[in-house]
């Protein structure tokens, strides 16, 4: 361990990441604007409350901002003027977003360099793992492992409420002190905005996603290390982490402050558990084990103290719920999953005597959360809150083919994402809402009723465009339709789904799994 610690310290001493001069380069903001998630962080007229900064973008604003940064000192800003100041120029709100967007692009550079260096010589593994990048790759793991487990900890990862916590986390990665001071000042400027002003602004998604991911990376680095110390079976790999950040320095602090003892290994030995699984998606993570309820309660207190002492965050134990898998629906990655007992009858025969044996087999069920789905569709104006399909007035001015293609795109994406559900009745209901909403939208455009429009266009008008892949197979091969129908009713995990964020239209994203 001392040799590894010495190597880590030597590697850190060689790192000289001077990122601060890049803040004054115009091309950085051009790259950041092109790669931005919102693509509209620059604007000339930020007067609209609902659509702020939606007008044409111009790098002239960036040039003026860089000129002001060269001339003025940020620490001499007058706090009396909330709209304009010496450093941030004509509009404090707009310039804060520009600076944060550019800084998000800049600070990713050391992460990318470390990632490239850590992956050298592993190109074959990378190419081989490209097919396993789907969100659905989690569910085969759950089906294979969760059926043997008893309890699960449903954890909501806390987000830091203070800017200084985020800055302290980044200092392990970014060795440039001026950049960290700049980040601290920019975050203070952003969070000093009033709440109504923040509601009108488009959140800088890329920047805050980066901050959150760095925060979670720090948490998981220490957590996985401690979990390995408390387990008979060490984790073979953990590919998400780019570097184990200050493990061996923090373990001494955790041993004296958090664990209240100097021997971390001896204390962790009290909760030895050979079978424990950890899965995270966005802000939620689950920790499942074969242990008893008492064992899981120990880990619950362990994690709460871990967040409070190491990250200086108040983490209430209510954020962690301990539930048995056999009667608990776990809301995770857009599914309601559970490991319930399913009866299975087996006929056995010994010589001339035959008898039936009733067995109970634990299987992982993945269900569609129908009520959140209907609520999401209602917000996107495809139906009302009761699930009754309605027309989409915004799309009524489009061409017929464009309307059908949009509805078909949404229907196919939802069908692919929820094709792994155990019960398809809810999926049929969602597809019915979208198909009838498409028919109502077309009837609204042609100023007719749905029945009259379908009679004029033909009964197969919508089926040709909204037919799913499974329906298409049954229609193409009618002789094998019975066998294909059995496949259609079974679970199908599409391993090419990484995200679905373009289901509704260009301005509003429908995310039915949240």
Swiss-Prot record:
GO terms for cellular component: chloroplast. It is found in: Plastid, Chloroplast. GO terms for molecular function: RNA binding. Coiled coil: none annotated. Pfam families: Intron_maturas2 (PF01348), MatK_N (PF01824). Keywords: Chloroplast, mRNA processing, Plastid, RNA-binding, tRNA processing. GO terms for biological process: mRNA processing; RNA splicing; tRNA processing. It comes from the Eukaryota. Usually encoded in the trnK tRNA gene intron. Probably assists in splicing its own and other chloroplast group II introns. Belongs to the intron maturase 2 family. MatK subfamily. This is Maturase K. It comes from Plantago argentea (Silver plantain).
């Amino acid at each position: 361990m001392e040799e590894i610690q010495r190597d880590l310290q030597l590697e850190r001493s060689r790192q000289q990441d001077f990122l601060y001069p890049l803040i004054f380069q115009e091309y950085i903001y051009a790259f950041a604007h092109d790669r931005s998630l919102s693509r509209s962080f620059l604007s000339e007229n930020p007067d609209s409350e609902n659509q702020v900064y939606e007008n044409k973008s111009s790098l002239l604003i960036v040039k003026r901002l860089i000129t002001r940064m060269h001339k003025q000192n940020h620490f001499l800003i007058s706090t009396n003027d909330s709209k304009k100041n010496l450093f941030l120029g004509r509009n404090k709100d707009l310039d804060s977003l520009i600076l944060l967007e550019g800084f998000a692009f800049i600070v990713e550079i050391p992460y990318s360099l470390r990632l490239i260096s850590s992956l050298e010589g592993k190109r074959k593994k990378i190419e081989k793992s490209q097919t396993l990048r789907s969100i659905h790759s989690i569910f085969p793991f759950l089906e294979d492992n969760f059926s043997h487990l008893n309890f699960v900890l449903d954890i909501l990862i806390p987000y830091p409420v203070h800017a200084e916590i985020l800055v302290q986390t980044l200092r392990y990665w970014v060795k440039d002190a001026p950049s960290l001071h700049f980040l601290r000042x920019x975050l203070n400027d952003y969070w000093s905005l009033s709440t109504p002003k923040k509601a009108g602004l488009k959140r800088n998604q890329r920047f805050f996603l980066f901050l959150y991911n760095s925060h979670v990376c720090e948490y998981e680095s220490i957590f996985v290390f401690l979990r390995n110390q408390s387990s008979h079976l060490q984790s073979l790999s953990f590919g998400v982490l780019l570097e184990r950040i200050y493990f061996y320095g923090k373990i001494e602090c955790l041993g004296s402050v958090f664990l209240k003892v100097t021997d971390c290994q001896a204390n962790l030995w009290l909760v030895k558990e050979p079978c424990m699984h950890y899965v995270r998606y966005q802000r939620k993570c689950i920790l499942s084990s074969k242990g008893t309820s008492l064992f899981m309660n120990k880990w619950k207190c362990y994690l709460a103290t871990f967040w409070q002492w190491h990250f200086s965050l108040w983490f209430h134990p209510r954020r962690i719920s301990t539930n048995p898998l056999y009667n608990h629906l776990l809301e995770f990655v857009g599914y309601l999953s559970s490991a319930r007992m399913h009866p299975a009858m087996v006929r056995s025969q010994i010589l001339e005597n035959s008898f039936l044996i009733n067995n109970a087999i634990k299987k992982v069920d993945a269900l569609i959360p129908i009520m959140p789905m209907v609520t999401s569709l209602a917000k996107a104006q495809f139906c009302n809150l009761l699930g009754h399909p309605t027309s989409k007035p915004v799309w009524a001015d489009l061409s017929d083919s464009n309307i059908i293609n949009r509805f078909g795109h949404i229907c196919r994406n939802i069908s692919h994402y929820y094709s792994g559900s155990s019960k398809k009745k809810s999926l049929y209901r969602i597809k019915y809402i979208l198909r009838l909403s498409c028919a109502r939208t077309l009837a609204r455009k042609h100023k007719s009723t749905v029945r009259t429009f379908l009679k004029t266009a033909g009964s197969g008008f919508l089926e040709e465009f909204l037919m799913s892949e499974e329906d298409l197979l049954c229609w193409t091969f009618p002789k094998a339709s019975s066998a294909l129908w059995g496949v259609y009713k079974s679970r199908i995990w599409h391993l090419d789904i990484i995200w679905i964020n373009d289901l509704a239209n260009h301005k509003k994203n429908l995310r039915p799994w949240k």
